Amino acid sequence: MIGWLLDTNVTAEIISAGGSARVKAWAAVQDEATLHLSILTIAEYDKGIANLPDGDPRRPVYMTTRDSLAARFAARLLPVSDAIVRRWGAISGTVRRDTGHPPPVIDTLLAATALDHDLYLVTRNVRDVRHSGAAVFNPWDDDHSAFAVLPRQRRRRPSQT
């Protein structure tokens, strides 16, 4: 893997004053260039903002947070491409067939994004993506030393025939 795709629950934990010390410690030792966000994380902030009543004092705070994340991760903000959507369709269908339950849409789209970009999916929602095929890291519980990140230039993709 070449880096980390942060789920919204991880970004919220990192920036929260009362966030998990373990999650913050993990994030603090990562090379910033290896951390990525999906546009879906920004959309989840938009959803949270839209869900607040008019005049809610948290609205400007959440808007500033969203805008700061978008700016900070601008070069590492991953879109939902056609390839990712098609991979998500395959993941969702397979998980539903194998488990009998439809998987959460956003979580499995994040898993498809992580797979497409050769990233670990960093989330607390391990149960929601465990059948996706993505490599999942839970910073609340997992030992990060077991998750190697290789420099991009050393990474090799198998040749396609």
Language-model features, listed with the residues they occupy:
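Residues that scaffold the ATP/ADP-binding catalytic core of kinase and kinase-like folds
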Residues: 13-14, 48, 87-88, 132, ...
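Acidic, PIN/NYN-like endoribonuclease modules and their adjacent C-terminal/linker elements
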Residues: 111, 115-161
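Short, well-structured N-terminal submotif of metal-dependent ribonuclease cores
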Residues: 1-41, 50-68, 145-146, 154-161
